[in-house]
Amino acid sequence: MSTVVRSGLLVAGALVVSLVMAPATGAYEEISVTEGGSLSGTVNLNGKVPTPKGYNLTTLPDAIYCGRISDGRGWRLLQPFDVGSKGEFRQVVVHLEEIDKGKPFGEYKAPRIEAVDCRFLPFVNVVRDLHDVVVVNMDPAMHDIQAYETSKLGPRVLFNVPLPISKRYPREAGLSAHVHKHYEGTPVAQTVKMTKGRRVFTMQCGFHAYMESWALVADHPYYTVTDGEGRFEMTDIPPGTYKVKVWHPYVRGEMEQTVTIEPGQRANLEFVVEAPTGRLYANQMVENAYVRYTITEGVQSQIVPTLEKQTYEGGGDE
């Protein structure tokens, strides 16, 4: 059986990211699920893809190495919205809300976040409270993890540690725009310890502000992140009626639908998220950057996008 629900959410532009508070529920109970059903579907973004964040590389460390990915004019772009040519909204968390029992979590494997080419990958993840995340530096440049939980009163620091560089890199590697080989530094494992009721976890590099990674903290195993086609799937769901929510760090609030899971059947949901409008963040590209940042042509000429020349045309894939 297939149940199709299509809905949109109007989101006003804002300079803040979404804040998600956990509902007041008891501990999740792991049970053996019999005649469980499944849920699949898609998430699409409707409207113009928002302008990416923009960072002038001459104002930050490692401009030459990190400038291997840039726009050719000294700017590094960070596009929080990963959207395909047909609106497929990738890297969005889809999860059930207020489910108190169901399938076991299974063996825990700490999420691995890589600092590679001066970006944290993946951009969106799911983590568990009181469990580890593992962060690895794959670059010849120094990175620093600053991890926070969000709150209406402001962020709270969870941990702040440096990321070791692999000793296999020659000393001058971090000063070159032509070093593209990656070596793994010593992995750093840190435990996520959230304040009760808070569910949004974020990391940023203390040296390179355009390096971000976000995660929703899960208290049950019924969650997934949309794939390259904006699709999602969950299995072994106990029969019943549930709220299904969609979360992205730069969309205010969560879209919510209700779905009934029948024994042994598959339900389908289609979510359409209206693209946020207006100015979403403080960091954006500016005109006349030479005047504002006193950038000389000599400095700019050293920042060469030898790995990826970034562009933005206001929609679809970059």
Regions flagged by a language model, labelled:
Residues 1-6:
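N-terminal secretory signal peptides that target proteins for export/translocation
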Residues 8-20:
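Bacterial N-terminal signal peptides
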Residues 14, 23-28:
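Small beta-barrel nucleic-acid-binding modules, principally OB-folds
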Residues 26-318:
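Extracytoplasmic copper-binding redox domains, predominantly the cupredoxin/blue-copper superfamily
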